């Protein structure tokens, strides 16, 4: 498997629960390195741009409203098979369907307030990383 980078966002619900460190521990325990990170409070424009792929979906407005409801923690994870590994750590989008021990099963409340976002493919990972960390804000470790 190749070394990959993927974007991860700890969403407002998980930030409010003060579980950033617990989630970071899961990334690192799984062999993922955090090569860039920042806390931000997304503007409506940023959230709309980032989730633009969903703009025609019925949940788009609620998603944007949720993502701007409080600060988020944004990080780039790097490691062998980082995209799939992060998605396994996150668990199913709906925490009720997520396997026990996954981030969403342990820290999410609903399909809307589901604790984390993770890139789903190498192409989207590259776009998402560049969206939040343009240029030289990501470092090899």
Swiss-Prot record:
Q: Which PROSITE patterns does the UniProt entry name for this protein?
A: NDPK, NDPK_LIKE
- Where found, per UniProt? Cytoplasm
Q: Which GO terms describe its cellular component?
A: cytoplasm
Decide whether keyword Cytoplasm is in the record. yes
SMART domains assigned to the protein according to its UniProt record, in alphabetical order = NDK
What's the family? Belongs to the NDK family.
Assembly behavior: Homotetramer.
| Name this protein carries in UniProt | Nucleoside diphosphate kinase
The scientific name of the source species is: Polynucleobacter necessarius subsp. necessarius (strain STIR1)
Q: What is the lineage of its organism?
A: Bacteria, Pseudomonadati, Pseudomonadota, Betaproteobacteria, Burkholderiales
